Regions:
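A shared catalytic/ligand-binding motif for oxyanion handling
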Residues: 1-160
Length: 160
């Protein structure tokens, strides 16, 4: 993420009072973490190609509660926070598009399952990001409302 874009994101996080921000399609070629003023960024991209990539960006207040971060791969990253009465795990994902090979879809969900198995059972869990899925406007009680977009796709059905 270039410095100009980073400054805009930090300003918007402050303006709308967002403490934790998930980013998809970062398109970086490395993994790691860095701080910029009062924000911390944990990111993971592909080693050679500038595609995919995920990041989690937090403000200083949230950073003080960080217990750890798992830079899994260019499609998912997890973040563990100390909370009360329960700790919190946030997983940021960037799912394959509908035209991806079946093997890539399978790999994505296997990797996600691995992250879920590493999540302590008592944690509050948030999975955020771009699922590249349409769930349609058909209501699924307890899962989706009736205000979805378009017709559901196979990726949407798998997500539900």
């Amino acid at each position: 993420m270039n410095q100009g874009k980073l400054e805009v994101v930090k300003q918007e996080m402050a303006r709308v009072n967002v403490d934790i921000l998930g980013i998809s399609e970062l398109k970086g070629t490395a993994m790691g973490e860095f701080n910029s003023d009062d924000h911390y960024i944990y990111y993971c991209g592909q080693e050679s190609l500038r595609r995919n990539g995920v990041a989690i960006m937090v403000n200083k207040r949230v950073q003080n509660a960080v217990l750890g971060c798992n830079l899994k791969n260019d499609r998912m990253i997890s973040f563990h926070l100390q909370g009360k009465p329960f700790n919190i795990t946030v997983i940021q994902v960037y799912a394959p598009t509908s035209n991806a090979e079946e093997a890539e879809d399978e790999w994505f969900y296997e990797e996600l399952q691995d992250l879920l198995e590493l999540t302590p059972k008592k944690d509050v869990l948030f999975i955020i990001g771009d699922w590249n899925a349409k769930v349609g406007s058909q209501e699924t009680p307890g899962v989706t409302g009736k205000f979805g977009l378009g017709m559901w796709r196979e990726a949407g059905q798998r997500l539900i």
